[in-house]
A protein has these predicted regions:
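Acetyl-CoA-dependent GNAT
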Residues: 2-108, 117-119, 123, 160, ...
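Conserved GNAT acetyl-CoA-binding A-motif
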Residues: 124-135
């Protein structure tokens, strides 16, 4: 069944909002105040239109999916404490892809990222996800360690990807939510097999 409602925040002081284009400035402010993700991936702070682009950017032509969710985790004053971009049923039913997951720098080190991600994962599983998928820029050590600690395994790499001022290598990672073997995932998403040279 396609996801029709936002995930619920597992942190009681935060509430979730869908970040549509009318909230682009709110997302842009969050990006500007929390540049660490962008510095680690593209080598430069978020661009002036990054918030709107995060919300409106489209997938490559021909890629199947059900919905792109851009979710904000809002403080009581309305400002954002975290955000996640999740694409449901990407390239195959039951594959949910995390495009972006950022937690405010001031919340690092206290377990909030783990709690928020686990809530997102529960939401995905309750809406039919059997596999979670994402890409990590090699050298972004904090992200690499975080996703490995959440049970993700590396499946393939893509090199020569331009992100801002940098040419980077992206490591695709996958996590089974229902105990499936990785061979079953490759049947659903053959482009993620290690020898595949296709775009992600």
């Amino acid at each position: 069944m396609p996801a029709t409602t936002l995930p619920v925040s597992p942190i009681s002081t935060l509430s979730t909002v869908e970040l549509t284009l009318d909230r682009a400035l709110l997302l842009q402010k969050f990006f500007n105040e929390n540049p660490a993700y962008f510095l680690a991936t593209s080598g430069e702070p978020a661009g002036p239109n990054e918030g709107a682009e995060e919300i409106t950017s489209e997938l490559p032509s021909g890629w199947s999916f059900t919905k792109k969710w851009v979710v904000g985790y809002a403080n009581t004053d309305g400002s954002l404490a975290a955000m996640a971009n999740v694409i449901t049923d990407l390239m195959a039913l039951s594959v949910f892809h995390i495009g972006t997951f950022i937690v405010a720098t001031e919340r690092h080190g206290g377990g909030d990222a783990q709690v928020l991600y686990q809530g997102l994962e529960r939401w995905a599983a309750s809406n039919g996800a059997a596999w979670m998928r994402l890409g990590v820029v090699q050298g972004n050590t904090r992200a690499e360690r975080f996703w490995a600690s959440q049970g993700y395994v590396a499946v393939r790499q893509r090199s020569g990807i331009q992100m801002g001022t940098r040419s980077v290598t992206v490591q695709n990672m996958v996590k089974p939510l229902m105990g499936g073997a990785i061979a079953g995932y490759f049947t659903l998403v053959p482009r993620d097999q290690p020898e595949s040279e296709s775009a992600p």
